[in-house]
Amino acid sequence: MEDYKQRIKNKLNVVPMEPGCYLMKDRNDQVIYVGKAKKLRNRLRSYFTGAHDAKTTRLVGEIRRFEFIVTSSETESLLLELNLIKQYQPRYNILLKDDKSYPFIKITKEKYPRLLVTRTVKQGTGKYFGPYPNAYSAQETKKLLDRIYPYRKCDKMPDKLCLYYHIGQCLGPCVYDVDLSKYAQMTKEITDFLNGEDKTILKSLEERMLTASESLDFERAKEYRDLIQHIQNLTNKQKIMSSDKTIRDVFGYCVDKGWMCIQVFFIRQGNMIKRDTTMIPLQQTEEEEFYTFIGQFYSLNQHILPKEVHVPRNLDKEMIQSVVDTKIVQPARGPKKDMVDLAAHNAKVSLNNKFELISRDESRTIKAIEELGTQMGIQTPIRIEAFDNSNIQGVDPVSAMVTFVDGKPDKKNYRKYKIKTVKGPDDYKSMREVVRRRYSRVLNEGLPLPDLIIVDGGKGHMNGVIDVLQNELGLDIPVAGLQKNDKHQTSELLYGASAEIVPLKKNSQAFYLLHRIQDEVHRFAITFHRQTRQKTGLKSILDDIDGIGNKRKTLLLRSFGSIKKMKEATLEDFKNIGIPENVAKNLHEQLHK
């Protein structure tokens, strides 16, 4: 199976069963088709299974990858689909388009207007509302309004009263001289409702329900109650499109397994025209990571500052304002809050997809290590150990090692190292120290040696490791280096005395395995570094507090783990773990200075 087909197959397995839009892309990464679905997974799978007509078969033959955006409802999917089609103008949306268009509700431009469901928009003949995702939702909305407002129903004015008049659903303008101002008020209320303003109609129905109930007309009161519930179920708040034309960017994020995904929705003229997805291995707290990201997002001249930036409420508004020179909004409720939540939900879906794909890819790792061994000219590397350093300007330098056996992570054999002999930010010496410590212990304890050692770095890192292995420890183990491009993505595998590039195809299983290894060792190293910095910061604070010695420091660290948790603790919390009252009081005061 061709590699792109396998990637598509893998991704199909992790698409959620939620409403949303999907974008099909060709070999040039151009959007060639945009669609919507009530259940994304089912719809996307349908393209790659079973028979199709000639046009759809041609479309599927050009697809090399796809993306999707989760929405909160089928209606949102429709509106987003229309925006995306307008933005990208995919050629297959034109080729596959038939005579069927989306339904609208129309208020006719007549002396006594009517409500219609139509798929044809003719300018100057009335007001149109929609589009609706399907005819059923449009008809249900019209039926609801017909029950509430006695609007004219007949196409042509009859010469006698019809059934609708006798059941209270028409004022009978065909026979009676109906007050035009009363009709105009009905038209206004219907227009407001179709524009999303349902408060007026709900208030009116609630008043009618209360009046009927007080008059002991419980059957009529129940009818009004049912209408209220029907409106609440039918009214679908639109988050993707808005009448608010303010230019804004909406941020949401999710954190899991040492990774952070940030989603940005670009809202222009009330429409979401684009979204940006960024994956970041966590090196700081999630809040600190977000502040760094959003500052770079606008300061590197990659994006134009909008009028407003919307962010989650857990973040420090002043901190963001210090790096982003525009209005910062943290919505507490309503459609704007819903949009921030939707961005966060899409971030969660993206992270879940990343982890699911990694898990599924493990089934093909044997082929990957065989391919890797062949390309490097070494025996199949059953056991691979990879190293990476982490520090900030030489502060609290650490290193980490991950182990892959048969191409799969062997987490019980992961190791963490605090750099002991190197002063300042010296990556080469740090790598030499860690490799020396690791394989000295392996030799002393008779532990298994790896078939391949991978370092995160280039020729300098490789030469340092080879020197320690061969000249200090007498070991002959293949050593390779992994380099990243300016986007911090795995780009090249280096091997040999002159650190030559190993010719691996970027879409090969071997290259993808290397990408996974580099991601994993980087994640493991920076997670350890963050933990080390937090503990170091906590210890330095504790050192300045009277009554806190080594034993009590250890007790506090073991009980609370972080300065944030200690600041949240009460005096009783400190006393409950054995800290004397006077020391606990002093500690509490110092932490809250």
From Swiss-Prot:
InterPro entries: GIY-YIG_endonuc, GIY-YIG_endonuc_sf, GIY-YIG_UvrC_Cho, RuvA_2-like, UVR_dom, UVR_dom_sf, UvrABC_protein_C, UvrC. GO terms for biological process: nucleotide-excision repair; SOS response. GO terms for cellular component: cytoplasm; excinuclease repair complex. Residues 17-94 form the GIY-YIG domain. The keyword DNA damage applies. One of its GO terms (molecular function) is DNA binding. SMART domains: GIYc. It holds the Pfam family UvrC_RNaseH_dom. The keyword Signal does not apply. Keywords: Cytoplasm, DNA damage, DNA excision, DNA repair, Excision nuclease, SOS response. The UvrABC repair system catalyzes the recognition and processing of DNA lesions. UvrC both incises the 5' and 3' sides of the lesion. The N-terminal half is responsible for the 3' incision and the C-terminal half is responsible for the 5' incision. Belongs to the UvrC family. PANTHER family: UVRABC SYSTEM PROTEIN C (PTHR30562:SF1), UVRC/OXIDOREDUCTASE (PTHR30562). This is UvrABC system protein C.
